[in-house]
Amino acid sequence: RLCIPVIFPC
């Protein structure tokens, strides 16, 4: 899956 730290911490 795509991991976007801006929306949620990976």
From Swiss-Prot:
Organism for this UniProt entry: Crinia riparia
Cysteine-cysteine disulfides: C3-C10
Keyword Nuclease recorded: no
GO biological process entries: defense response; positive regulation of leukocyte proliferation
Predominant location: secreted
Name of the protein this chain belongs to: Riparin-1.1
Keywords: Amphibian defense peptide, Disulfide bond, Secreted
Functional note: Induces mouse splenocyte proliferation through binding to CCK-BR.
GO cellular component, one term: extracellular region
Subcellular location: Secreted
Tissue spec. comment: Expressed by the skin glands.
